[in-house]
Amino acid sequence: MKKLLLVTTVLTAFIAPVAQAHHVWLEQDGKTVKLQFGEFGENQRETTPGLLDKFVAPKATLVGAKGERDLTLEKTAKGYVVGGAVSAGDAIVVEDNAYPGWETTKDGKTSQHIWVPAARLATTFAAQQPKLALDIVPTGKAGEFKLFYKGQPLPKTKVNAIIPNGWTKEAVSDDNGTVTFDLPWKGMYVLEAHHTDKAGGERAGAAYASASHTTSLTVMQPKGVATMAAGPAMAPSAAH
C-alpha cells in the first residue's frame, strides 16, 4: 500500500508540472483569432486527440469601447477558433477556470491543487484594465506592460517576452508590477508569466491548497528588425 501511494504521489507530481510548463496564447491570422496550447517559443501546439482535450470550459470575452461581449470558442484539431470580429483597440481575453486539478500527498495528508490558464490579445499598445485573475496589460507607453493578480499589481515576478523563432527576453516586474521590453523585432510577441497562490480556496464546491496561474499577452510590433522564421514545428506531447 505504501509503495502504491508513493507511485501515485510521484505520478501526480510529474503530471502537474507538464501542464504548467505549457501555456495558452492567442494568435491572429488575418481575421481569424485562435487559442493555442503548448510552447510558443518551441513552435509546439497541442492537438486533439491529445492534451488539448484537457480543457473543460474555456471562456472568451471581447473587451472593447462598447463594453464586453462573450465570444464562442470552436474546438478544432489544432486549437480553438474564436468567434466574432476584433477591431483596432479591442482586446480578447480567455480563461479556463475548470481545467482538471491534481493532488499531492505528503506526510499522509492529501492536498488538491488547480491550474488556471489564461490569455489576452491586445490589438494596440493602448492602456488596458486587468480582467483575468493573472493578467498582463499594455500601459500605453512604448514597451511597457503591467502584471496584475486579482486586480492588484504583482511585483517581483518574472515575465518572458517571446517571438515565434524562440528568441526570449526576461524581465522582473518592479514594485508597481511594471515590466519594460525593447521589442526590437517586427511581428508577434507573446509575453508570459506564472504565479502560484498558496492561500488556498474553493472551486466548484471543492477546496484546494494552491492555485497555479499561467497567463499570456499577445501583441503585434508593427516596426522593427525582420526576424528569422520559426523553426520546424515540435510534435504535440504524448497524452496522459
Language-model features: locations:
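Gram-negative bacterial Sec-dependent N-terminal signal peptides
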Residues: M1-Q20
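Beta-strand-rich domain onsets/edges
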Residues: A21-T32, T105-G143, G205-H240
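Beta-strand-rich structural segments
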Residues: K31-Q44, V137-Y149
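Short acidic/polar inter-strand loop motif in beta-rich domains
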Residues: E42, A98-T104, D197-E202
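Short amphipathic beta-strand segments in non-cytosolic proteins
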Residues: P58-E68, T157-A171
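Mid-chain, structured segments of secreted extracytoplasmic proteins
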Residues: V63-S111
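Glycine-centered loop-to-beta-strand initiation motif
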Residues: T76-V82, S173-G187
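A short, solvent-exposed beta-strand micro-motif common in secreted/extracellular proteins
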Residues: D90-N97, M188-T196
